[in-house]
């Protein structure tokens, strides 16, 4: 799967799970299980419940994703 095939959508973190996994409610109403990307892990960016994030989904499995960006608070 190439990067162009990935679906990128915004959502809100609702639950923090073990092993850097998170439950995310997407803006379209779906709920996905997401892990954090390597750059977020390497730069020690903290993700807490209530944070707005960008999630990358594959077209093959729309129930799992990767958190690629934490959006700034307004």
Curated annotation (Swiss-Prot):
SUPFAM superfamilies: Nucleic acid-binding proteins (SSF50249)
GO molecular function, one term: rRNA binding
GO annotations of cellular component type: cytosol
Location in or out of the cell: Cytoplasm
Tagged with keyword RNA-binding: yes
PROSITE patterns: S1_IF1_TYPE (PS50832)
Keywords for the protein's UniProt record, in alphabetical order: Cytoplasm, Initiation factor, Protein biosynthesis, RNA-binding, rRNA-binding
SMART domains hit by this protein: S1 (SM00316)
Primary site of residence: cytoplasm
Superkingdom of source: Bacteria
InterPro entries per UniProt: NA-bd_OB-fold, RNA-binding_domain_S1_IF1, S1_domain, TIF_IF1
Pfam families listed in its UniProt record: eIF-1a
Protein biosynthesis recorded as keyword: yes
S1-like domain location: 1-72
HAMAP family associated with the record: IF_1
Self-association state and partner proteins as the record states: Component of the 30S ribosomal translation pre-initiation complex which assembles on the 30S ribosome in the order IF-2 and IF-3, IF-1 and N-formylmethionyl-tRNA(fMet); mRNA recruitment can occur at any time during PIC assembly.
PANTHER family the record matches: TRANSLATION INITIATION FACTOR IF-1, CHLOROPLASTIC (PTHR33370:SF1)
Function: One of the essential components for the initiation of protein synthesis. Stabilizes the binding of IF-2 and IF-3 on the 30S subunit to which N-formylmethionyl-tRNA(fMet) subsequently binds. Helps modulate mRNA selection, yielding the 30S pre-initiation complex (PIC). Upon addition of the 50S ribosomal subunit IF-1, IF-2 and IF-3 are released leaving the mature 70S translation initiation complex.
Family: Belongs to the IF-1 family.
Name of protein: Translation initiation factor IF-1
Organism of provenance: Thermosynechococcus vestitus (strain NIES-2133 / IAM M-273 / BP-1)
Lineage of the organism: Bacteria, Bacillati, Cyanobacteriota, Cyanophyceae, Acaryochloridales
């Amino acid at each position: 799967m190439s990067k162009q095939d990935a679906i990128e959508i915004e959502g809100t973190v609702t639950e923090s799970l073990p092993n850097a996994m998170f439950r995310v409610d997407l803006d379209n109403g779906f709920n996905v299980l997401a892990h954090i990307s390597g750059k977020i892990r390497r730069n020690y960016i903290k993700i807490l419940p209530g944070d707005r994030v960008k999630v990358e989904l594959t077209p093959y499995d729309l129930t799992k994703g990767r958190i690629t960006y934490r959006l700034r608070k307004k």
